[in-house]
Amino acid sequence: MKKRLFVLSLILLVALDQLSKFWIVSHIALGEVKPFIPGIVSLTYLQNNGAAFSILQDQQWFFVVITVLVIGYAIYYLATHPHLNIWKQLALLLIISGGIGNFIDRLRLAYVIDMIHLDFMDFAIFNVADSYLTVGVILLVICLWKEEDYGN
């Protein structure tokens, strides 16, 4: 992926995350639940003082340090490995985008705005950035697993 496309994609993904959070705050009261796709997904405005899926509540300094380290390492890795396959680049793009999206909330608000609730299962309320992070990590694990299978 070309550097310009990567940066543009990063900006668009972070903007989508931030716009979704802005919309939730503007249209749904704190704690209110609104069906989005009935029986499947509801939107609920929640202020999360923890990490993805509400773990490690009230550890803001920890998340700031970890986020800076992970994003910094991912950017360093991309810069020092210019010929990564597209899947690894996509995985790192999602991880960086998700990290930045939640980092903006932590710096600006001291909490992260969550809003997506899966009605069909007992699961934590999460946000778009959490989705990026989750998919990015899963994709990266698959890439690394495949490399191991091929002896790389």
Curated annotation (Swiss-Prot):
Q: Which PROSITE patterns match?
A: SPASE_II (PS00855)
Q: Name one Pfam family in it.
A: Peptidase_A8
A GO biological process held by the record: proteolysis
Query: How would you describe this protein's topology in the membrane?
Result: Multi-pass membrane protein
Kindly list the GO molecular function terms attached to this UniProt entry.
aspartic-type endopeptidase activity
Instruction: State where the protein is found.
Output: Cell membrane
- Which major enzyme category is it? hydrolase
Q: Where are the transmembrane segments?
A: 5-25, 61-81, 84-104, 125-145
Query: Where's it mainly located?
Result: membrane
For this protein, the Enzyme Commission number is: 3.4.23.36
Q: Where is the active site?
A: D114, D130
Catalysed reaction equations from the record: Release of signal peptides from bacterial membrane prolipoproteins. Hydrolyzes -Xaa-Yaa-Zaa-|-(S,diacylglyceryl)Cys-, in which Xaa is hydrophobic (preferably Leu), and Yaa (Ala or Ser) and Zaa (Gly or Ala) have small, neutral side chains
Keywords associated with the record? Aspartyl protease, Cell membrane, Hydrolase, Membrane, Protease, Transmembrane, Transmembrane helix
Question: Pathway, per UniProt?
Answer: Protein modification; lipoprotein biosynthesis (signal peptide cleavage)
Q: Which GO terms describe its cellular component?
A: plasma membrane
For whether the record's keyword set contains Membrane, the answer is yes
Q: Which NCBIfam families match?
A: lspA
Q: What is this protein called?
A: Lipoprotein signal peptidase
User: Organism source for this protein?
Assistant: Streptococcus pyogenes serotype M2 (strain MGAS10270)
This protein's gene is called lspA
